[in-house]
Amino acid sequence: MEIMTAKEFLKQYEEADRKARQHKAEYERELEMIGSLSVKMDGMPHGSNISKPTEEAALKLADRALKWKEAEENALRIRQEVYDTICNISGIEGRVLYERYINLHKWEEICILVHYSWNGIHHVHRRALQLVEEMMVLNGTHIR
């Protein structure tokens, strides 16, 4: 098992979500490119054969779709692990962790949501990270 801090553990979902969105964007970009490859706009009739470039692009698109699906499944699995951990933290500490690491809000947004100052929210966050680290130690999860 990988050794990580509480913060690294919690931030895993943000990275996995970013990767899934990146795969989705690439899939959509390639889908758009296939459309432009397969349409000839010269007004002349053409056969129904699929060109080699279009066929290759379609195969790449299928591969991209699989990578996107795998990335989304990974993000959902990690999200659930992080969510389950955060659910064990009560009070404002749990709320701050939820907004930061599940809803992926920025600190400014969290300050507004929970009516805390910038310094106050970071103080709560430090306490929350300590609680997560204590929980990781109790559960036998490796931390540094």
Show the residue positions of the predicted features:
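DNA major-groove recognition helices of helix-turn-helix
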Residues: 121-135
